[in-house]
């Protein structure tokens, strides 16, 4: 019996959910994307930028030991760029668990 690829499945769902969230937010008007709520990272647009950049930084840290540093003066990411970054990190995480964690080995929390 083959082990159930739990981490790969979780990362696959994570990628799907991130891209789905981005897809939903793409359909929002500019006014809606500029709105904010309690507990967010500013506006919806700012929150999207934050979570996509953070995802890239987490992935970089896992792969290289170093965080990704987004230039301070860089313009905001477009929706196409955010989708590309999310795909790159999401697919990289899935590939990482397929190739870096031997079958039957446990990952300590």
Regions found by a protein language model. Give the residues of each.
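Aromatic-glycine hotspot motif
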Residues: 1-109
């Amino acid at each position: 019996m083959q082990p159930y690829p739990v981490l790969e499945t979780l990362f696959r769902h994570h990628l799907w959910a991130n891209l789905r969230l981005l897809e939903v937010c793409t359909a929002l008007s500019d006014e809606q994307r500029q709105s904010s709520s309690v507990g967010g990272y500013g506006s919806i647009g700012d929150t999207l930028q934050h979570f996509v950049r953070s995802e890239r930084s987490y992935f970089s840290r896992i792969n290289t030991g170093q965080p990704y540093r987004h230039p301070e003066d860089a313009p905001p990411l477009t929706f196409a760029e955010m989708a590309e970054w999310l795909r790159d990190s999401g697919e990289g995480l899935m590939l990482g668990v397929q190739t870096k964690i031997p079958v039957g080995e446990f990952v300590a929390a």
